[in-house]
Regions:
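Flexible, low-hydrophobicity surface segments
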Residues: 1-176
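C-terminal catalytic domains of large/alpha subunits in multi-subunit enzymes
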Residues: 2, 85-86, 255-260, 290-295, ...
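Glycine-rich loop/linker segments at domain edges
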Residues: 24, 30-33, 100, 177-224, ...
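Helix-loop-helix junctions that connect adjacent transmembrane helices in secondary transporters/permeases
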Residues: 163-254, 419-497, 699-706
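N-terminal glycine-rich phosphate-binding loop and ensuing alpha1 helix
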Residues: 769-822
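Conserved alpha/beta core of the MobA/IspD/sugar-nucleotide pyrophosphorylase nucleotidyltransferase superfamily
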Residues: 772, 920-972
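Conserved N-terminal catalytic core of the sugar/cofactor nucleotidyltransferase
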Residues: 800-868, 883
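Conserved beta-loop-beta/alpha segment of the NTase-like Rossmann-fold superfamily
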Residues: 848-916, 920
Length: 972
C-alpha cells in the first residue's frame, strides 16, 4: 500500500499485508555502524586512563575466609585500592534483574567472608593498568577454612550442610524459600485428581529427564565503566538488559539512594539472558564510589565461563497418562532445579518448566506441577533464552513421543489430537485462553517441509548409518502478565521528524528497529524519520527491561499508545494555529489538513510553531502493562543421520514454523529463530558444563566448552504462520527470550535430536534395557583395610563413582543401577537411595570367595530385570569421570555392542560391557576369575572404547594409589 493512501487504524486484523512499515524487512538501524567497526561498545567508550578493576576468586567450593594479607599487594606501583569483605557494606541483595519485590532471595554481599563456589569473589583490586593489578592479585595471601561442599544438587534439600546458614538471608516473596533447608523456592500447582485419572489411563509414561547447565556464550563478555559526574552522582555505563533494575540493585548493594546513580547502556554484543543479572556492574561501581575515580571491569572469557549465570540445571520427572486411542488425559510434573550458590532467577525459571509446557496440551482432565529449587556449591545459575521453559518442554515433548511409540501412533498424529487450539483454555497457564493460536498450522507446515510421510520413522542407508525424522512443539509467553511495564516517549523535532526514547535494551537483535517500524506505522512516516535514544535511567521512561520476551509485545504497545497520543496533540496545535475545530482536522503523516477550509500545515511548520507562544508540548509518554501473556508457538521438525558405530548424530535438515502473531520484521525474526535453533542444537550435541569432584569447572574456555558454528549445522529453514493477537501491537506477540528471540526454538531441538538418537538406535528399534552393575565387594587384601570404606576427599572411596553413576542412571529411563556388595555397612548407607528409587542393592556374602561370586549375584539380579546388557563398573575406580562413564554406556548401547571395554595406552580394563548372550558364561566363572576371561574368549566381538587419561582408570589396590590427579601427589 502506498504511503500517500495510507491511513493508520488501531485494528489491522486480516489486513496486515496493507501495512507500510510493519511486516516489512527493514534493515537494522545500527547495521552500518556495527559492520564498519564504529566505537559503540562499553570498552570502546571507556577512557584509556580509568582504573582497571579485577577480583581475586575463591579456589574452594565452600570455605570461610579467615584472613587476607594484602600488604605486599598494596605496595605494587600503580595499585589504587584493594578491598576485602571487611570493607564492603553488609546489607544483602540479589543480582537478579526483576521487578521489586524480587522473587529471588537477598543472599548476596559484594564480598562475603563465606565463599560458596569456586570463583566466588574474595577481594577487589583496582589499579592503573592490567599488569599491576594482575601482579597485586598474585601477591594476596588468603587463609581459608575449607568446608564440606554440596556438589550434587540431589543431596541438597534438607542436608545438614547449609549453603546459606546466615541469619541475614531473606526472601521478599512467598515462594517457598527456606535457607535452613537449602531451598530457594518450593511450590505445587494442580487441577483435578491426577492420581485418579492416571489410574484410569491405558498407558502411563514415567521418566526423569535431566537437562544440564549451559552457557549463554555471548560474544561480548560482561563489562562496565563507571565515573562520577559534576553533581557527585555515580554514572554506570554497562552492557546490560536492565538499566532500571541495575540502578536499584546497585543502590541496594552500595547503600546509596537510587537518585545518586545513573545507569545507561551502549550497544550490546549479545546477552541471551545473561545480562538480566548484574554480574560485572557492582565491582567497578564500588571502586568508583569509594575512590571518586573512573574505573572499568572487563570479564575475561574464563571469568564469563566460571563466574557468570548459565542455564539452570534441572531434573524433570514426568508421568503422562493416555488412552489407547492417543487421548492424553493427565500430566504430573516435578522439577528439581539447581540454582547453584545463589538464588538469582531460581524461583522464576523453575515455574516456566511447567507453566510453559503443560499448556500445549489443551484437553487435559488433570495436571499437577510441583518443584523444588535447591542451593548447591557450584556457580550460580540465572536467565538464559527459554528461561526454564526449555527444560520443561524437553521433558514433556519427550514423554509425548514415548507415549506415541508405546501406543503405535504417529508422533505428529498424537500431537494433532491433543494440542491446544485457538479459543481453548490453556491448563496450567494462569487461567488464560489461547485467543491467538496457529500451532496446528505450524505442525502441519513443518510436516510438509521435512517430508515426514516419506521419511518417518527411519531409513537404513546401508553404510552403517540410519536417518530419521522427529517432531516437537513449543511455546513461550509474551511478557510477565500484570507485572512487566514498557514505556516510550515520542517527541517532535524542529524539522518535523521524531525522537523516540525507550529503556528497552537492544542487544543486537534489533528492537530499536522494530519499535521504530511501529512508530513509523502509527505516525505515517518513514522509519528513517524516527531517531531512537536507548536505555538511560536519566532520560528514558521507566521500562522493566528487555527480558521475558516482552519488548515487542509490551514496549511495542507503549510505542503505539504514545504515537496515538502525540497525533492528537499535533492535531490540537495545528487546529489552534489554523483556527479550526480540532475534531475536523486530519493527521496525514506529512502534516495536518482541514478539508472544509482547505487549510493545512506541514510537520515542519507545526514543529516551528510549537517553539513559540505554545502551551502544548509536542511529545507524549505512555506506558503499557498487560493482564495476559499470549504465547507464541512453534513446531520444529528435524532430520538427523546417526552413525551406528560411533553414535555420532548429524543434523541434516531442520524445518521450523513459528506463530508470533504479526511478524514486525521478517528478516530480523528469521535470523533470531535461526540463532535459537543453533543454540538448541548446541545444547543437545555439543555443550555441557562440567565440574571436578572439588567443584572446579573443567570446560572454562572455548577450547573445552564447544559451541557450534554454522559449519556444524545442516539446512535450517524458517517459516511463519501468523495468528492475530488482539492485545498486541499490530496483532504481534513475542518472538524472543529477552528481546526478539523465539524462546521455544531452543527447546525443540534437544527433545527432537535426543529422542531420535534413541529411536534410530541400530535397526530403528526400542532402546536396550541396561543394568549398570556396580561391584562393591572387593576384599582389599593389599590395601591393609577395607579400601571401599576408606575416606577420600570427604566420603568413602566407593561413593565417588557410585554417586556419578546414580546421576547418569537417573537421566536414562532404560538404565538401572544395581550395587552388589558383601558389606552390610554399604547396604545401610545406601538404604535411603534405594528407598528413593535411585538404585537397587544385592547382598552377596559369598563375594568373600572371589569376584566370580559377585558377578554371578549381579547377573542373576540383572536377569530378573530383563536386562539386555550389563555394564560392569568397579568401586575402586574413584577417579572415573561422569562424562567418560556416560559416553561409554551411550556408545555401547548405541552400537548394540555384544561385548565392550575401555582401552587406554593399548591396555584393556574396566568398565566392561556384556550383552545378554554372554550372561551364562559370566555365571559359569569361578574363584577370583572376572569378566576379562569372557572378553578374551570372544575378543573379535569386543567393541573398544578409548580413554586418553590413564588416571581416570586408576585402580586403588594400595594406599600409594590414592593419587591426586591435580597435583600428582598423594592423599594422606
Amino acid at each position: 500500500m502506498s504511503r500517500e493512501n495510507h491511513i493508520y487504524e488501531p485494528d489491522w486484523s486480516g489486513r496486515t499485508d496493507q501495512l507500510c512499515s510493519v511486516n516489512k524487512p527493514v534493515i537494522k538501524k545500527d547495521a552500518l555502524a556495527l559492520v564498519t567497526g564504529k566505537p559503540v561498545y562499553v570498552d570502546d567508550l571507556a577512557p584509556k586512563d580509568c582504573l582497571i578493576v579485577k577480583v581475586l576468586r575463591s579456589p574452594h567450593a565452600n570455605a570461610i575466609v579467615k584472613s587476607v594479607k594484602k600488604t605486599a599487594a598494596e605496595r605494587v606501583p600503580g595499585i589504587e585500592a584493594i578491598y576485602t569483605w571487611e570493607d564492603v557494606p553488609k546489607q544483602r541483595f540479589t543480582m537478579a534483574g526483576q521487578t521489586y519485590p524480587e522473587p529471588s532471595p537477598y543472599d548476596r554481599l559484594i564480598l562475603d567472608q563465606h565463599v560458596r563456589y569456586v570463583g566466588d569473589p574474595v577481594a577487589i583490586i583496582a589499579g592503573k593498568d592490567e599488569k599491576c593489578v594482575d601482579r597485586a592479585r598474585k601477591l594476596l595471601k588468603v587463609e581459608y577454612e575449607v568446608l564440606p561442599a554440596i556438589l550434587d544438587f540431589h543431596q541438597s534439600k534438607d542436608n545438614e550442610l547449609l549453603v546459606h546458614p546466615e541469619e541475614s538471608w531473606k526472601s521478599l516473596c512467598p515462594v517457598g524459600a527456606d535457607n535452613q533447608r537449602n531451598l530457594c523456592a518450593s511450590a505445587e500447582d494442580h487441577n483435578g485428581d491426577v492420581e485418579a485419572v492416571l489410574a484410569e489411563c491405558d498407558e502411563v509414561v514415567e521418566h526423569t529427564y535431566h537437562v544440564r547447565a549451559a552457557q549463554q556464550a555471548m560474544m561480548e563478555t560482561f563489562r562496565t565503566y563507571c565515573f562520577m559526574d559534576t553533581y557527585g552522582r555515580l554514572n554506570v555505563l554497562s552492557s546490560t538488559q536492565i538499566v532500571y533494575h541495575a540502578r536499584r540493585i546497585l543502590s541496594n548493594a552500595l547503600g546509596i539512594p537510587k537518585s545518586k546513580i545513573r545507569v545507561s547502556k551502549p550497544r550490546i554484543g549479545g546477552g541471551f539472558g545473561a545480562k538480566q543479572t548484574v554480574v560485572a556492574e557492582i565491582f567497578p561501581a564500588f571502586v568508583t564510589w569509594k575512590t571518586g575515580k573512573p574505573s572499568k571491569m572487563i570479564f575475561t572469557r574464563e571469568e564469563s565461563q566460571t563466574a557468570s549465570t548459565p542455564r539452570h540445571e534441572m531434573e524433570v520427572t514426568i508421568r503422562l497418562g493416555a488412552m489407547k486411542d492417543g487421548r492424553i488425559r493427565a500430566i504430573d510434573l516435578y522439577t528439581l532445579s539447581n540454582t547453584g550458590a545463589y538464588g538469582e532467577h531460581g524461583p522464576t525459571t523453575v515455574g516456566l518448566s511447567g507453566h510453559k509446557s503443560i499448556p500445549m496440551y489443551g484437553s487435559l482432565e488433570a495436571y499437577r506441577f510441583a518443584y523444588d529449587v535447591v542451593y548447591s556449591n557450584v556457580m550460580s545459575a540465572g536467565a538464559y533464552r527459554g528461561y526454564g521453559a526449555t527444560q520443561g518442554i524437553f521433558a514433556v515433548e519427550s514423554a509425548v513421543s514415548e507415549m506415541a511409540a508405546r501406543l503405535g501412533i504417529d508422533p505428529i498424529r498424537i500431537r494433532e489430537q491433543n494440542m491446544v487450539r485457538e479459543g481453548q483454555f490453556m491448563p496450567a497457564y494462569y487461567g488464560e485462553t489461547a485467543n491467538s493460536c496457529a500451532l496446528d498450522q505450524c505442525v502441519e507446515r513443518a510436516k510438509e517441509m521435512i517430508g515426514w510421510d516419506e521419511k518417518y520413522p527411519c531409513r537404513d542407508m546401508g553404510n552403517g548409518k540410519v536417518r530419521s525424522v522427529g517432531i516437537a512443539m513449543a511455546m513461550q509467553g509474551s511478557c510477565i502478565s500484570n507485572l512487566d511495564v514498557g514505556s516510550a516517549t515520542i517527541k517532535v523535532n524542529d524539522d518535523g521528524g521524531y525522537t523516540m526514547l525507550i529503556a528497552a535494551a537492544d542487544m543486537g537483535t534489533g528492537c530499536d528497529t522494530i519499535l521504530s517500524q511501529m512508530a513509523a506505522e502509527c505516525l505515517e512516516c518513514d522509519v528513517d524519520d524516527i531517531t531512537v535514544v536507548g536505555a538511560d535511567t536519566d532520560t528514558s521512561p521507566y521500562d522493566s527491561g528487555s527480558y521475558a520476551s516482552s519488548t515487542t509485545y509490551i514496549t511495542g504497545k507503549a510505542v503505539e499508545k504514545a504515537c496515538m497520543t502525540l497525533r492528537k496533540r499535533i492535531c490540537a496545535l495545528a487546529a489552534e494555529r489554523m483556527n479550526v475545530p480540532e475534531d475536523e482536522t486530519e493527521f496525514t503523516g506529512t502534516g495536518v489538513v482541514h478539508e472544509k477550509s482547505g487549510s493545512s500545515m506541514t510537520m515542519e511548520e507545526i514543529a516551528t510553531a510549537a517553539m513559540c507562544n505554545n502551551g502544548i508540548a509536542l511529545e507524549a509518554t505512555e506506558s503499557n502493562c498487560s493482564p495476559v501473556s499470549p504465547p507464541p508457538y512453534m513446531a520444529g521438525a528435524v532430520e538427523i543421520e546417526l552413525d551406528k558405530e560411533t553414535g555420532e548424530v548429524r543434523i541434516l535438515d531442520y524445518a521450523a514454523v513459528v506463530d508470533c502473531g504479526t511478524v514486525i520484521n521478517p528478516n530480523l525474526a528469521r535470523v533470531q529463530v535461526e540463532g535459537g535453533l543453533v543454540q538448541g542444537i548446541g545444547m543437545t550435541l555439543f555443550e555441557n558444563i562440567q565440574y571436578t569432584d572439588k567443584g572446579q569447572m573443567i570446560n572454562n574456555s572455548f577450547m573445552q566448552y564447544k559451541v557450534p558454528t554454522r559449519l556444524d549445522m545442516g539446512k535450517l529453514r524458517v517459516e511463519f504462520r501468523s495468528s492475530y493477537e488482539p492485545t498486541g501491537p499490530f496483532g504481534a506477540k513475542s518472538i524472543g527470550a529477552g528481546t526478539c528471540n523465539l524462546q521455544c526454538d531452543g527447546s525443540v531441538v534437544p527433545r527432537t535430536a535426543d529422542h531420535e538418537r534413541a529411536d534410530c538406535n541400530g535397526n530403528c528399534g526400542k532402546r536396550m534395557r541396561v543394568t549398570i552393575l556396580y561391584l562393591a565387594a572387593g576384599n582389599s587384601r593389599r590395601f591393609g583395610e577395607n579400601k571401599l570404606l576408606y575416606p577420600l576427599d570427604g566420603k568413602a572411596v566407593y561413593r565417588h563413582l557410585l554417586d556419578r553413576l546414580a546421576q547418569i542412571a537417573g537421566r536414562h529411563e532404560n538404565w538401572e543401577l544395581l550395587v552388589v556388595t558383601q558389606y552390610e555397612r554399604i547396604l545401610e548407607e545406601l538404604a535411603p537411595l534405594v528407598k528413593a528409587g535411585r538404585l537397587q542393592t544385592v547382598f552377596s556374602p559369598d563375594s568373600e570367595k572371589g569376584i566370580s561370586y559377585t558377578i554371578r549375584a549381579g547377573i542373576e539380579a540383572a536377569e530378573k530385570q530383563n536386562a539386555d546388557a550389563c555394564a560392569c563398573f568397579v568401586a575402586d575406580q574413584p577417579y572415573l569421570k561422569e562424562e567418560t562413564a556416560e559416553r561409554f554406556l551411550e556408545s555401547m548401547e548405541m552400537q548394540k555392542a555384544p561385548l565392550g571395554c575401555v582401552f587406554c595406552g593399548g591396555e584393556s580394563g574396566n568398565p566392561a560391557w556384556f550383552s545378554k548372550p554372554y550372561f551364562s558364561e559370566l555365571k559359569e566363572l569361578s574363584g577370583d576369575r572376572g569378566g576379562k576371561k569372557v572378553l578374551k574368549r570372544h575378543w573379535e566381538s569386543v567393541i573398544p572404547f578409548l580413554v586418553e587419561a590413564a588416571w581416570e582408570l586408576k585402580d586403588l589396590d594400595r594406599k600409594e594409589d590414592l593419587c591426586c590427579r591435580d597435583t600428582g601427589g598423594c592423599h594422606e
